[in-house]
Amino acid sequence: MSRRTDRQTDRQTGLIKLIQYVFGYVWLPLSKISIPFRGEYITKSGSTAGDIPVILGGQEPAYYIDKCNHTGEIVVVARSGVSAGFVSYWDEPIFVTDGFGYESNSEWVTTKYLFYILKNKENELNSMKRGAGVPHISGAALSEVKFPVPSLKEQERIVSILDRFDTLCNDISEGLPAEIEARQKQYEYYRDKLLSFKELKP
């Protein structure tokens, strides 16, 4: 990379951080705040059974094999089919196949915050699928979707609150159905509130 390009990048980064400081957040495309990880083609019949979940595109692992193609934190967006746009978070070894994986660009976002802002747009992502037969989401279109990015400190605060609600919802799985539903609605309400940012107009 040339010095000129370096200076341009530094100026862009400085401007973005200035806007973030003045307004409290800035809108950035997914391509700016994440590092893409594309899944690999695999078949169950051509694999050896194991305990590594295969993320095929549904809301649950498709099956389990003996090898992984990613370790550490990652957010996966299902690429095709009925569940296209479904967002999941993983912090264990997995094998990503029919899905878009996104690691966080740590300069801008934490992985868990990236998960929550994508999860909050799940319906919008699902509506982006195109094509006859088995519809799919375009990776190029997905990379252009913009998200609100506050400071890393504010992200940690938001994630801390949403994590507590998520834990609470999961921990009362033995409770009454009405209580579970009420907690889930409360969680979704606060998630929407915490992740609601106005568009910045020039």
What are these regions (language model features)?
Residues 1-202:
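Charged, alpha-helix-forming regions
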